[in-house]
Amino acid sequence: MKLIALGDNVIDYYHNTQECFPGGNAVNVAVHAARLGAQAEYLGSLGDDDMAHIVEKALRENGVDISHCPVLQGRTTKVCSYDVVNGERSFIEVITGESWTGPLQIGAQELDELKTADLIVSSCNAKMPEQMAAVQALPAVFAYDFGEKEKYRTDAYYDEVCHGIDLAMLSCKPMDKAAFAELCAPLHRRGVVHVLATMGAAGQMLSVQGK
């Protein structure tokens, strides 16, 4: 199986330990898929700064293909800053700077590469909602992570990104079945087949076309 993780890459920087780690939803998906034995590829815009080199090195070391990623000269990598407090990370700020690479712009070459995938995974963090219709029109199974923020759970956002999603994933607080059904309803109305809510230690719930 070939998986292409489409979208974001960042550096997580921890101020109080002065450590840097590669991250981003798409990067994490690609790495974990490769570790589980899948043929994994990351597709997203890369800068040419030192932080981008950290991301590239980690992806290569984990067996992830990045050969189709555009490398944008003079552009920088988004940095998410945290402190670690009592073993938990505490968010400080996001630094994009004036030269951030920005979201990937999908052209003919990227579409041709995406056609080779069996599974495409993207997310709200890719910042590519207006490009999702073209991706979902491809033959691959398509999974989309809506994250945890309410701004990605509006009717307007759903209308923009739901054009053939096979699996929608949402990070949620613990809820009962009635609340879960209410969460799923607008997605199922827009043709989403499977909706998965993850609730941390409270477990998960899956809805298949409202069942």
Which residues does each predicted region cover?
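Substrate-binding N-lobe of the ribokinase-like
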Residues: 2-3, 9-79, 85-86
